A protein has these predicted regions:
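Conserved ABC ATPase signature
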Residues: 157-161, 165
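ABC ATPase NBD coupling module
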Residues: 89-105, 206-208
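Helix-to-loop junction immediately C-terminal to a conserved catalytic motif
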Residues: 72
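A short, proline-enriched helix->beta-strand linker immediately N-terminal to the Walker B motif
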Residues: 176-180
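Short coil-to-helix segment of the ABC ATPase nucleotide-binding domain corresponding to the Q-loop/switch region
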Residues: 117-125
Length: 254
């Protein structure tokens, strides 16, 4: 899913995601354009509170993925200010970006697992890249395998896994480093409803440990399953007032 759209029309801020209080994430008048095209995200201003649960909703092409890319520092904005953990990351030297990225877990829509590595080795990658001692890596991987229910698949290769199993591997890999923020792009888009519920339970348990969750989805039924979550609805590159979105939720994958 590639963020897109234009930025015509009125400008509304998402309720519950805007305020003067400093948060773990702050966007101020952020805009993004690719190349010489029109802006795909326009005048985004919001603050996310540490430990909260957020859904980013909107139609395909609304700009959800583009927003997530800026959150996990894969994309710099064209204009505006972004602060993560109290630091201006727009002007952050590239040499410091990896240190910030280690504080942010990412679950990609297409999983991005390494096909020739086992499930256990895929999950271990972030810790090994960070130079963690191997004994600690093994213990952490064992814990993650149990958490996502894949202990008996530790030596399997990703191509032999179902879509739901691959997604659980991706989640375990994203959280093994105990990130302060977890960003997930359509994490339930390739699984059935039963697996979607299981993944949501994993996210909720992680949020219960204090991790800030930002999940992009077009599955409206997910919104009603996490009553405490706040909603950031994007339409044509702008944040809109989500009031009433849950009163008459459309069907799954609306």
């Amino acid at each position: 899913m590639k963020g897109g759209g234009t930025c015509d029309g009125g400008h509304h801020q998402a309720k519950g995601c805007r305020g003067p209080v400093a948060g773990i994430v702050q966007f101020e008048n952020v805009g993004l354009r690719y190349g010489q095209g029109e802006e795909v995200l326009c005048d985004l201003s919001f603050s996310l509170t540490s430990g909260d649960f957020y859904f980013v909703t909107g139609a395909s092409g609304a700009g959800k993925t583009s927003l997530l890319k800026m959150l996990y520092l894969a994309q710099r904005p064209t204009r505006g200010a972004i602060r993560l953990f109290g630091t201006d990351v727009v002007t952050l030297p590239r040499a410091r970006i990896p240190g910030f990225r280690r504080r942010i877990g990412v679950v990609f829509q297409d999983f991005r697992l390494v096909p020739h590595l086992s499930v256990a080795d895929n999950i271990a990658l972030p810790l090994r890249i960070a130079g963690v001692l191997e004994d600690e890596v093994r213990d952490a991987v064992s814990e993650m395998l149990a958490w996502v229910g894949l202990t008996n698949r530790a030596e399997a290769r990703p191509p032999t896994l179902s879509g739901g199993e691959q997604q659980r591997v991706a989640i375990a890999r994203a959280v093994i480093g105990r990130p302060e923020i977890l960003v997930a792009d359509e994490p339930t888009g390739n699984v059935d409803e039963a697996m979607a519920d299981r993944l949501l339970q994993l996210f909720a348990s992680l949020n219960g440990l204090g991790t800030t969750l930002v999940i992009a989805t077009h599955d409206m039924q997910l919104l009603s399953r996490v009553r405490s979550a706040q909603i950031m609805h994007i339409d044509a590159g702008r944040l809109l007032d989500p009031t009433g979105l849950l009163r008459h939720p459309p069907g799954r994958h609306a």
